[in-house]
Regions:
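Active-site neighborhoods and metal-handling regions in enzymes and metal-associated proteins
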Residues: 1-159
Length: 159
């Protein structure tokens, strides 16, 4: 079985705008995780993330999405981090997928470097990203990559 997680960390001194971007991005992932409920569409996750980002006048990179995960590292489920009613797959107990919003100070559009790996926002503004692997349960959600230290003060699960 596979798991997938990542986080953004400040290295050295950073400006207040970058610090706020990291904080709001982490809040966004927990808003998305909180929206995981059996019987609800995946679009609820995107709505929760996008609404919180917009509240802080930030954008959501659209080209990179969460994915189904389990025996295969990437499976067919796509978890958008912005609202799109067409993302109507209904969450069912036993489903596992990642939630991994990339939040930006600027445009949601991106461009690829010549190395065919590195992606940057089209306007060159900074981004931050957090990711967890989650399991839909009968009563809500289990954060599978939420081991010791992974659940922060922004998490509704830390209270």
């Amino acid at each position: 079985m596979h798991g997938d997680t990542n986080a953004t960390f400040a290295v050295g001194e950073i400006d207040n705008e970058s610090r706020e971007l990291i904080k709001v991005t982490e809040e966004c992932i927990w808003r998305g995780i909180e929206a995981v409920k059996a019987g609800r569409p995946l679009s609820d996750i995107g709505r929760a993330i996008e609404d919180h980002a917009k509240l802080h006048k930030l954008g959501v990179v659209r080209a990179f999405v969460g994915h189904g995960i389990g025996e295969q590292f990437h499976s067919d489920i796509q978890v958008l981090h912005y609202y799109d009613a067409r993302n109507s797959v209904v969450m069912r107990p036993g489903m596992t997928f990642t939630i991994e919003p990339m939040i930006t100070l600027g445009t949601w559009q991106h461009k690829m470097w010549d190395d065919d790996w590195t992606a940057v926002t089209a306007d060159g503004k900074r981004t931050a990203q957090f990711e967890h692997t989650v399991l839909v349960t009968e009563t809500g959600v289990e954060v599978l990559t939420g081991g010791t230290g992974a659940v922060s003060g922004f998490s509704p699960f830390s209270k």
